[in-house]
């Protein structure tokens, strides 16, 4: 009888705990898992592969209107090679450089090592569903002065600096609008994992798995750049996993709605900012590190006495292992419009809602 109890306990623990290995090997989620509003929009449909563009209706938050390549044909990447000066048809670089809308998919599993940063044109979707796609060990993605880009279901890691100027970010969003980054895995890049800078806005970052990195996510170019005061970013349903140090995110001047994310033992701080940004932390799940001096969730950088009046609010967050938000300020709720709003759950539900963060292992004819 005792051995039976032990076996049952081990099985329950295995199903209840999200594993780092799952994030690396792509998630296969049990059908009974609680789905967040984005995933509930499409994952229950076993015929997802026959209408891939339906995904474009599923974003929430400030990036809700991002349509990517919804109004264009499917383009299948068949060749993982890269030639920055003369991209070959069938390669990812060839697809993203086209002027027309495209919904880009992949014929098989592949690792793409880029020789220079991948400049993504407007009205493009990179859709990794149905294949295990990695962009790694070279320069990575740049979304510059474009609009309507969706990046879904790929792994981006070990990104290098580009000799032609990119710092080595996983994804850099520069002067761009209507961008949605969903169900990606990001880790170990030379600079940031995701930067949203220089007047970029209308961005949603959701369902991603971040791990093993220092400066995770930057929103806003620098403290003196006033153009970012109109920046609006939604960060929802992500897992900030082991080995992260800071910037989850760091915000400058603009507005960030940080909702229903899971934070696992950051090393310095989780959410920070400078230059008087507005931050609303809602329904997150914070597990503090063991180090006593790092248990505060927030950090105000280069801040004088006025920083105590910054509008950094917390609502329905869960604080574990001694985590605490810091001096709470006025709550400024997001002014969503046109269907951008979504139901934010209490932080206690976040372990379930984020259990499928990262790329999903999807098979044609089956629910993801």
Swiss-Prot record:
Belongs to the polysaccharide lyase 1 family. Glycans are attached at residue 27. Transmembrane segments: none annotated. Keywords: Calcium, Glycoprotein, Lyase, Metal-binding, Signal. GO terms for biological process: pectin catabolic process. Pfam families: Pectate_lyase_4. Pathway: Glycan metabolism; pectin degradation; 2-dehydro-3-deoxy-D-gluconate from pectin: step 2/5. Its EC number is 4.2.2.2. Binds 1 Ca(2+) ion. Required for its activity. Ca(2+) binds at residues 167, 191, 195. It catalyses: Eliminative cleavage of (1->4)-alpha-D-galacturonan to give oligosaccharides with 4-deoxy-alpha-D-galact-4-enuronosyl groups at their non-reducing ends. It is an enzyme of class 4 (lyase). This is Probable pectate lyase 4. It comes from Arabidopsis thaliana. Its cofactor is Ca(2+). The active site is at 247.
């Amino acid at each position: 009888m005792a051995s039976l109890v032990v076996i049952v306990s081990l099985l329950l623990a295995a199903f209840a705990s999200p594993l780092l290995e799952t994030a690396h090997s792509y998630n296969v989620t049990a059908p009974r898992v609680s789905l967040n509003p984005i995933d509930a929009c499409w994952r229950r449909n076993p015929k997802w592969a026959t209408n891939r563009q339906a995904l474009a209706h599923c974003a929430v938050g400030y990036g809700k209107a991002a349509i990517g390549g919804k109004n264009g044909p499917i383009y299948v990447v068949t060749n993982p090679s890269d030639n920055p000066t003369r991209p070959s048809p069938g390669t990812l670089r060839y697809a993203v450089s086209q002027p027309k809308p495209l919904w880009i998919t992949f014929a098989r599993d592949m690792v793409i090592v880029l020789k220079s940063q991948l400049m993504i044109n407007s009205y493009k979707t990179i859709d990794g569903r149905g294949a295990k796609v990695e962009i790694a060990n070279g320069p990575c993605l740049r979304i510059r002065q474009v609009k309507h880009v969706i990046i879904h279901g790929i792994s981006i890691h070990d990104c290098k600096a580009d000799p032609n100027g990119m710092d080595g970010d996983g994804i850099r969003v520069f002067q761009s609008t209507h961008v949605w980054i969903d169900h990606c895995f990001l880790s170990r890049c030379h600079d940031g994992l995701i930067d949203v800078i220089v007047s970029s806005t209308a961005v949603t970052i959701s369902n991603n798995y971040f791990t093993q990195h220092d400066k995770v996510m930057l929103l806003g170019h620098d403290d003196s750049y006033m153009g970012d005061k109109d920046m609006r970013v939604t960060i929802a349903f992500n897992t900030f996993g082991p080995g992260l140090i800071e910037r989850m995110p760091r915000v400058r001047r603009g507005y960030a709605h940080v909702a229903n994310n899971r934070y696992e033992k950051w090393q310095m701080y989780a959410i920070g900012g400078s230059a008087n940004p507005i931050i609303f932390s809602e329904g997150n799940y914070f597990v503090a590190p063991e180090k006593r001096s790092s248990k505060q969730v927030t950090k105000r950088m280069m801040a004088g006495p006025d920083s105590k009046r910054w509008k950094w609010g917390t609502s329905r967050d869960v604080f574990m292992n001694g985590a605490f938000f810091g001096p709470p300020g006025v709550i400024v709720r997001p002014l969503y419009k046109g269907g951008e709003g979504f139901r934010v759950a209490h932080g206690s539900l976040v372990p379930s809602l984020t259990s499928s963060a990262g790329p999903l292992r999807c098979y044609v004819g089956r629910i993801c």
